[in-house]
Regions:
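Short, charge-rich amphipathic interface segments used for partner binding and complex assembly
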Residues: 29-56
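N-terminal acidic leader/helix
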Residues: 1-26
């Protein structure tokens, strides 16, 4: 794996974790149960703008 590929992979991983944490927190604060908040976290990851991440 090249340095560029590794850097991109780390960037995507960080963005996924950040999106999931924010999605879970927002859902929990809105009163969703653990399961609902987890689903919201996964949806937040699915909605990431991957093109923007790749462009930098």
């Amino acid at each position: 794996m090249t340095e560029e590929m590794l850097s991109l992979a780390e960037k995507v991983r960080s963005a996924c974790i950040e999106a999931a944490l924010r999605g879970y927190e927002r859902a929990s604060l809105s009163g969703l149960c653990h399961e609902g908040a987890w689903e919201a976290a996964i949806d937040a990851v699915r909605q990431l703008d991957l093109e923007a991440l790749v462009r930098g």
